[in-house]
């Protein structure tokens, strides 16, 4: 087996699993975090924290470190990072690890929207909302004074929540029982979610289905077309079949 120098753009559970797999396959792996989350779960192997300074900075890093393979395993909504990776990769093999999007079931009541602004507009007057969109984009919902509810995230938002909003700080995975309880206990009428996919947070959708609660589902942003796999195994197999490493 040829040892590869691999840079994983991480921050997801999938990225951690990939780092583990590639390291145990004998590769030289570094995982890079953007530094947005203050206390991320650490992967195996070497870790780099902080931005690269845009496309040029990432391109210089790939060259300086003699990276053979760049894997974009960031969140499906990390559009800027993915665009930078595509622009900077050059001759470096670029792969994307992206979990499949969730698909509405026949008994679901999903309201499909393109972005945060559309999600805010889609909520009816005086809705009791559960926000599961992370900490960065809470403000537009809070600005609608007729809305109330719960905002759940891993780390606190910089936005001050008014009295009619509650903050839940939790890290997934979540059970069906706990999701049902949150929706019921807070009298939630609408769930707002990004279509992140994956099993760690899927139970909120099952709970909403069971309670017949509408889901405002925000579509994934468009990303550059690159070779994409939905599983760690797919990435690992692809890398194992590559020719001689560069440099």
Language model features with spans:
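C-terminal functional extensions of proteins
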Residues: 186, 195-207, 215-247
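N-terminal basic/disordered segments at the start of proteins
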Residues: 6-35
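Glycine/small-residue-rich loop that forms an oxyanion/phosphate-binding "nest" at active or ligand-binding sites
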Residues: 59-116
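N-terminal beta-loop-helix "entrance" segment that forms/cooperates
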Residues: 20, 30-53, 108-109, 160-167
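Short, polar loop motifs at secondary-structure junctions
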Residues: 31-39, 97-103, 116, 135-138, ...
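Glycine-rich, highly charged phosphate/nucleotide-binding loops
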Residues: 46-65, 169-178
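Histidine/lysine/aspartate-rich catalytic loop segments that bind and position anionic ligands
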Residues: 142-173
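Internal active-site segments that recognize and position negatively charged phosphoryl groups
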Residues: 117-149
